Amino acid sequence: MRASAVLRSVICRTLAVALAAFAVLSAVIPVPAFAADSDQQVKTVRVGWLINNEGFQDGTPGERLSGWGYDYLQTLSYYTPGWQYEYVSGTFTELMDMLEAGEIDLMPNISYSEERAQKLLFSSNPEGAERYYIYAKPDRDDLAKGDPQALQGLTIGCNSGVMQTFVGQQWLANEGITCTYREYDGGSMLFDALANDEVDAVIMNDTISSPDASPMFYVGSSDYYFAVPKSRPDLMNDINAAMTAIARVNPRYNDEVKANYSA
């Protein structure tokens, strides 16, 4: 056999052995995933997606999504290279329980409280501010006069476990108003109940709106934040850095993204 043929044979065998060894190592050594458009490692972030909150989070995960809450998340991800969202739908109460248990990683639009801060991390800066109102149909002239006593004995719709309900019910109690409360899941269901005359009024924030509802009484306000489980300080570090970057580019972003979906 010629020397050149022997050399080719040796090279081929060596290459075959090397490829086989690489295949074995690839099977046992995990290879990190990276974002397609960067050298950043992919970080899957499970985000709570509120049902029945049109304007804030529209659509169903797996289909077309929109809303100012969705737009804010997309802007946030631009400044957090490698983030990949996985949306998990549910009611506010369900999603908060999942967040505290670490079953999801992120919830937007969460008001701060000392009780919540025992289980969650909040962004250093607020995502925005919301005002709380008692809404009624525009033709309720009795409520439009501004006298809280006109609410006496009415049936008022509210969401369970949310800040505007706590604040609104406390305001009503301070005014000496006795009402019947009826709970619904999501802001859209509240406005539907009002439109269908299931309730006389509703307690709601101004993050979503309805042409069939007018704010009659202002009952309070609060800032709201991004929140993550205490076990995910890495995510909160990313969020704080991203929010600072967004504010440097557009200090009015928090107001503008919300205004895009105002009725």
Regions found by a protein language model. Give the residues of each.
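N-terminal secretory signal peptides that target proteins for export/translocation
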Residues: 1-10
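Bacterial N-terminal signal peptides
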Residues: 14-27
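Sec-dependent signal peptide cleavage junction
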Residues: 24-39
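Extracytoplasmic small-molecule ligand-binding "clamshell" domains
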Residues: 36-118, 158, 174-176, 180-184
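Short, solvent-exposed loop/turn elements at domain surfaces
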Residues: 54-60, 116, 143, 166, ...
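Extended ligand-binding regions for polar small-molecule ligands
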Residues: 67-80, 138-163, 219-263
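Acidic, polar ligand-binding/catalytic clefts
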Residues: 70, 74, 86-150, 206-221, ...
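Pocket-lining segment of extracytoplasmic ligand-binding domains
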Residues: 136-211
